[in-house]
Amino acid sequence: MERQLEAYCAHLRNERQVSEHTLLGYRRDLDKVIAYCKEHGIADWQALQIQQLRQLIARLHHHGQSSRSLARLLSAVRGLYRYLNREGLCQHDPATGLSAPKGERRLPKVLDTDRALQLLDGGVDDDFIARRDQAILELFYSSGLRLSELTNLDLDHLDLAAGLVQVLGKGGKARVLPVGRKAREALQAWYRLRGIGNPRDRAVFITRQGNRISPQAVRLRVKAAGERELGQHLHPHMLRHSFASHVLESSQDLRAVQELLGHADISTTQIYTHLDFQHLAAVYDSAHPRAKRSKGNDS
């Protein structure tokens, strides 16, 4: 089973061009399935049946795994079995018809517009790290990139004169996104210190040693910026969520936001309509003279 899993992971990495972060998530989930199979004497993928997979899901749910995590595990299992069936290594899919237990869908955390501007409009030292980090923050918020999309950017993916960036999203799907004026200015300032012709790596964002910056390093730099400028926890995906929420709030164009984010299914994008409603409700509560009743006037 491990050998076939290794072959599947190699397929995802080399042919599907899945990011290392996503690949590690798939591997962790499928390792749980292998551990369950070993525990129950299941020697190969063909022998795993729907009843056993359902039992594993129930056990993990009982031990506190979220519905979202279990849905991701089932998605990983389905992907593996699609590969095994296509390669003639298996003739069924035990995940067919299975779904994760329903859970409450949490709304993504976002910065409001004022907080986003507070983060980005602070003073920036004219040094290598500060200029790089500012360009990272501006590009996340300007274009709504995923972490893997940002760290995989090469110099020829950006056209600052045209204000465009080409990214490779999930499933190897390419899309072209606009880059705002402030982000272009931050990138130009970063390029002056980066030394375009010197470092070995063609990555847009590099370390002092000239190597492509890692996703973990970006997470730490974004976290540090959030603590320094806002006094709060901040992660790259919160900037992507903020980008989506603010564009939707201004444009009311859900399809456009779907395209910008690279979502295959618009239902994934629709969660931002709930955030927009929360904003509208807050505006209503603060602005409408009869939106709130004072205490003691409830009779």
From Swiss-Prot:
PROSITE patterns on file: CB (PS51900), TYR_RECOMBINASE (PS51898)
Q: Which GO terms describe its cellular component?
A: cytoplasm
Alphabetized, the UniProt keywords read: Cell cycle, Cell division, Chromosome partition, Cytoplasm, DNA integration, DNA recombination, DNA-binding
The Tyr recombinase domain covers 106-285
Core-binding (CB) domain residues: 1-85
The subcellular location is: Cytoplasm
Q: Name one GO molecular function term.
A: tyrosine-based site-specific recombinase activity
Choose any GO biological process term that the UniProt entry carries and state it.
cell division
**Catalytic residue list:** 146, 170, 237, 240, 263, 272 (o-(3'-phospho-dna)-tyrosine intermediate)
Gene3D superfamilies associated with the record: 1.10.150.130, Intergrase catalytic core (1.10.443.10)
Q: Which InterPro entries match?
A: CB, DNA_brk_join_enz, Integrase-like_cat_sf, Integrase_catalytic, Integrase_recombinase_N, Integrase_SAM-like_N, Recomb_XerC, Tyrosine_recombinase_XerC/XerD
Q: How does it assemble?
A: Forms a cyclic heterotetrameric complex composed of two molecules of XerC and two molecules of XerD.
Record's family?
Belongs to the 'phage' integrase family. XerC subfamily.
Question: What the protein does?
Answer: Site-specific tyrosine recombinase, which acts by catalyzing the cutting and rejoining of the recombining DNA molecules. The XerC-XerD complex is essential to convert dimers of the bacterial chromosome into monomers to permit their segregation at cell division. It also contributes to the segregational stability of plasmids.
For this entry, the protein name equals Tyrosine recombinase XerC
Native source species: Pseudomonas putida (strain GB-1)
Q: Which gene encodes it?
A: xerC
